[in-house]
Amino acid sequence: MRLTPHEQDRLLISYAADLARRRRARGLRLNHPEAVAVITDHLLEGARDGRTVAELMVSGRDVLGRDDVMEGVPEMLHDVQVEATFPDGTKLVTVHHPIP
């Protein structure tokens, strides 16, 4: 199987998010890279499902809460940005302060 660098990046995000979700299911609090992976995967999959940029910008703030992540992670995570593929093309999705 041959993947482009872009496809490799998305596969890595998906795998990292899956690993982070399994850790969260075991009761562990997520670190910064794990939190970014989970939120980014949510945005990529939402775009694939046909949701709008505006919907994803709102729902991206509901993926994780302060209780899901290690202390200090919400303060380190100001924005999450990803270029997601929508039915009408690729668009940049930005979620400001994703962990309220």
From Swiss-Prot:
It comes from Mycobacterium sp. (strain KMS). One of its GO terms (biological process) is urea catabolic process. Belongs to the urease gamma subunit family. One of its GO terms (cellular component) is cytoplasm. It is found in: Cytoplasm. The gene is ureA. Heterotrimer of UreA (gamma), UreB (beta) and UreC (alpha) subunits. Three heterotrimers associate to form the active enzyme. InterPro entries: Urease_gamma, Urease_gamma/gamma-beta_su, Urease_gamma_sf, Urease_subunit. PANTHER family: UREASE (PTHR33569:SF1). GO terms for molecular function: nickel cation binding; urease activity. Its EC number is 3.5.1.5. This is Urease subunit gamma. The keyword Cytoplasm applies. The keyword Hydrolase applies. It is an enzyme of class 3 (hydrolase). Pathway: Nitrogen metabolism; urea degradation; CO(2) and NH(3) from urea (urease route): step 1/1. Keywords: Cytoplasm, Hydrolase. It comes from the Bacteria. It catalyses: urea + 2 H2O + H(+) = hydrogencarbonate + 2 NH4(+). Pfam families: Urease_gamma.
